[in-house]
């Protein structure tokens, strides 16, 4: 079956934090004439608190419950570009929602590149909690090794963003995306 025969509703972006999901979602939405949504923003708005506060008050399980509910809600909207949280793919229910409602791009990057990006992101420490008690580099390696098979299984396309700029990544996604997603402006 070719990409034109598949009629996905949404374009999902998955990958570890710092890989460029939120930035790329906005660029893709503009090029495809679609709205974009960041799942973490939906969760924070609905909860009225930051992800770090949700983790602190409700534990990771509470956060993942909120994440699943938010994904279900946004998946029912008209076509969007959706930046998923880095761990959204941890739950089978979420992977099923993604598979049944859209086309998914896995933005990947080398651990040292992710660490550098996270160090340069002022919101990371305030907004996103540490998932382990390890150093940032060790945490990235550990979490990525656990999530990689899930990203791989969920993705229709994998892009290594390590040494590429957003324009290159944007072009690759637009060229690979099924024609049923948005109205691409390739100019």
From Swiss-Prot:
Names of the cofactor(s): Mg(2+)
Biological process, per Gene Ontology: amino acid biosynthetic process; aromatic amino acid family biosynthetic process; chorismate biosynthetic process
InterPro entries: P-loop_NTPase (IPR027417), Shikimate/glucono_kinase (IPR031322), Shikimate_kinase/TSH1 (IPR000623), Shikimate_kinase_CS (IPR023000)
Main location: cytoplasm
GO cellular component annotations of the record: cytosol
Pathway: Metabolic intermediate biosynthesis; chorismate biosynthesis; chorismate from D-erythrose 4-phosphate and phosphoenolpyruvate: step 5/7
Localization of this protein: Cytoplasm
Binding-site list for ATP: 18-23, 128, 164
Recorded catalytic activity of this chain's protein: shikimate + ATP = 3-phosphoshikimate + ADP + H(+)
Cofactor note: Binds 1 Mg(2+) ion per subunit.
Family named by the database record: Belongs to the shikimate kinase family.
Subunit structure: Monomer.
Stored HAMAP family: Shikimate_kinase (MF_00109)
Protein name: Shikimate kinase
Originating species: Rhodopirellula baltica (strain DSM 10527 / NCIMB 13988 / SH1)
Organismal lineage: Bacteria, Pseudomonadati, Planctomycetota, Planctomycetia, Pirellulales
